[in-house]
């Protein structure tokens, strides 16, 4: 079993490929199957339970915990995304949208009108409302929604022009070691009611940028620029910014780059994503809730953001390291935190700060935010099934799905089936092709060994360029492309060097992170060899060690806080518990 470091080497990519962007296929042309579809369906069903129905979803200021618009916006967003990914009509979304105007204030946004100060959590919550409404409009094209989007943008965000430049970013002024799973207003400085979720105002920035993308309203540009400039001045690590808010802001930067054509914003997002990878990502690719606060908990909202951001940075750079990172986030973090009811919950953060190598449940379900964002996360996984760039089709992830690429009046349809990530076989059946000759681009992940490719059972030479496989050919209906490869177990250094010991390591089988559910602490050597067996465990040939993947499909036992410990950090000597 090899020992390697997981290091993204991106310097050649940051400046060289800034103008390249590949685009995902439309939801209408993607039908996912298998475990991903089941995850989407369970999340969709959860978002249609009573808590999220029209008579319950609209909250007072007190009920929301001073987060006006947050629950409503995230719920609309989750339902819109789940609906597109599953191709099912939401049961209650129309009624929610019909009732929405009744719950807006006299200025057309959620929460009270505060004439004398800026309310950070109100801007964040209404930012989610903007995101939900924008995605609803893009999906339905219902023009009346534009008036609500415009009122929120004009009467709440535009009203704050000049205030964003003085948003308090001095670490010495901010209360940096407080906060619960749901943030709260913790202090007032310089005309700002500030949240313990430090930096959540920039969640609103992402919503405003998407509103601008749709409205194309020039008056919003100075406000967006003011918010962007202030975000770029924040020392995320020193101020201990919330990772979810910071990653959402970075997604906003990429969105703004796509709108403006200014690739500087991609570069700035990339720099901050690297900071997050070093100081904000846990040992199984979840997140510390705040930068540098290693004794806290994770939040699937940020996991969703990190997954989306990794793929979006790949779109702009074509750096395959981002694809590998996205795979590990998906299987070991996003899937890990989806609970038995389809919602999403928080985990602990194994490492030195909490003195444990064990991954465990912290909160069964973050029903107030992460369950809804999980809908967007899973839907983006479906959307990212395939991408196109000047006629080249990229299939960056292996999924069970049917998808179609349409170019003018011509198209090609594939049915993809695979046993990955447990096995190394992927098959693409061509249902029909009127495009003629085309180029397909598959990933050649670093964990894929002895790759072979065949068409209709006849093996062909693999055209591997770096970590991509390219196939340029003319396909007809019923043709079959097959990929075969071997997956191996690999040792990797810890993700966060500040919160782990130098002798500790992580184990992977392909993208799947391995763990021990044994009652006793497991010790491993760097050269320990593990092989998968039919019972789902990985066994060592020369010891009684057996491990499993932390990935699960909504395991009903992973629910109660502290009841299902999995060892994910391994070392040669036993860790002394204090």
Q: Which role does the model predict for each range below?
A:
Residues 40-41, 45-66, 111-128, 168-203, ...:
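Carbohydrate-binding/catalytic loop surfaces
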Residues 82-97, 136-150, 211-225, 257-270, ...:
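Structural helix-adjacent loops and short alpha-helical linkers that scaffold large soluble proteins
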Residues 17-74, 78-113, 144-151, 161, ...:
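Low-complexity, Ser/Thr/Pro/Gly-enriched N-terminal "stalk/linker" regions
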Residues 66-84, 93, 121-138, 195-212, ...:
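Well-ordered alpha-helical segments within folded domains of soluble proteins
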Residues 269, 323-429, 464, 484-578:
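C-terminal beta-rich recognition modules with glycine/proline-rich loops and embedded aromatic residues
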Residues 435-455:
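Beta-strand-rich binding/interaction modules
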Residues 448-472, 491-499:
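Solvent-exposed beta-strand/loop surfaces of large extracellular or lumenal domains
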Residues 258-278, 293-342:
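Catalytic-core region of carbohydrate-active enzymes that cleave or remodel glycosidic bonds
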